[in-house]
Amino acid sequence: MAPANLPSVFNATSQDIEMLLAAQSHIGSKNLQVHMAPYLWKTRQDGVNVINVGKTWEKIVLAARIITAIDNPADVCVISARPYGQRAVLKFAAHTGAQAIAGRFTPGSFTNYITRSFKEPRLIVVTDPRTDAQAIKEASYVNIPVIALCDTDSPTEYVDVAIPTNNKGRHAIGCIWWMLAREVLRLRGTIYNRETPWDVMVDLYFYRDPEAEAEDKVEEEKLAGVEEVGPAAIESGFATGGGDWEATAPAAASGWDDAAAQPQNWDSAAQGAASWDEAAAPKEGQW
């Protein structure tokens, strides 16, 4: 599946193809849009369309070359209303200097200059043409080129460059955005050569459930607390307060061998006490 329309320097490595397959970027939907037919490899017996990952890699390189052609990185706007792509576009923007719109796209952001969120990008990249339809529609009004991650059933109206991939899986979306960011940095010279691996793991671009993140944070705090209490207790309680275990114990304040201050004659001591056999004194008044 190696792309034949690219210079040899842009050819995908076996690791890149394996990563695309492992992320299930080649698994499309059962529906097929007519403009996505050239990117189809085959249709399985269960009706699922399989995407040609060689075509996917070609479009990743093409999209990266278009993004690199923009002089100011901030003039590129990456958009994702789909939750699985929000973390990916934020990381892409952080690594490449682009603007990110993660979540709901405010209508009028490209056409209404009165709004606070008004932007004038020279290029937009969207995660899903269906969920990001408002952004694509406004971009068509102001002549902004559009790059989109398109599944086999995605509408391609007003899309200039379609990257054929699975745009519904969390791993597939993160993998494509990670590869696109890496290719942009390679073309800009941030990554010196193609043999040098990028030190950013692809896992950073994957969607994570907020509840799972909160649980992981609680577990980390518990483990950190256990690790801090153990050495701290040993150092402060035993090491500093314990002293020398073999040292002789200090003498008591008063000698235990001295005779206690007790009466010598118990009979004389009891003489002043009233006899238990005597009758009780009469009460002063009657109830």
UniProtKB/Swiss-Prot annotation:
The gene is RPS0. Residues 247-261 have a biased composition (Low complexity). Component of the small ribosomal subunit. Mature ribosomes consist of a small (40S) and a large (60S) subunit. The 40S subunit contains about 33 different proteins and 1 molecule of RNA (18S). The 60S subunit contains about 49 different proteins and 3 molecules of RNA (25S, 5.8S and 5S). Interacts with RPS21. Pfam families: Ribosomal_S2 (PF00318). Residues 235-287 are annotated as: Disordered. One of its GO terms (cellular component) is cytosolic small ribosomal subunit. Keywords: Cytoplasm, Ribonucleoprotein, Ribosomal protein. The keyword Cytoplasm applies. The keyword Ribosomal protein applies. Belongs to the universal ribosomal protein uS2 family. InterPro entries: Ribosomal_uS2, Ribosomal_uS2_CS, Ribosomal_uS2_euk, Ribosomal_uS2_euk/arc, Ribosomal_uS2_flav_dom_sf. It is found in: Cytoplasm. Required for the assembly and/or stability of the 40S ribosomal subunit. Required for the processing of the 20S rRNA-precursor to mature 18S rRNA in a late step of the maturation of 40S ribosomal subunits. Its main location: cytoplasm. It comes from Pyricularia oryzae (strain 70-15 / ATCC MYA-4617 / FGSC 8958). One of its GO terms (molecular function) is structural constituent of ribosome. This is Small ribosomal subunit protein uS2. GO terms for biological process: ribosomal small subunit assembly; translation.
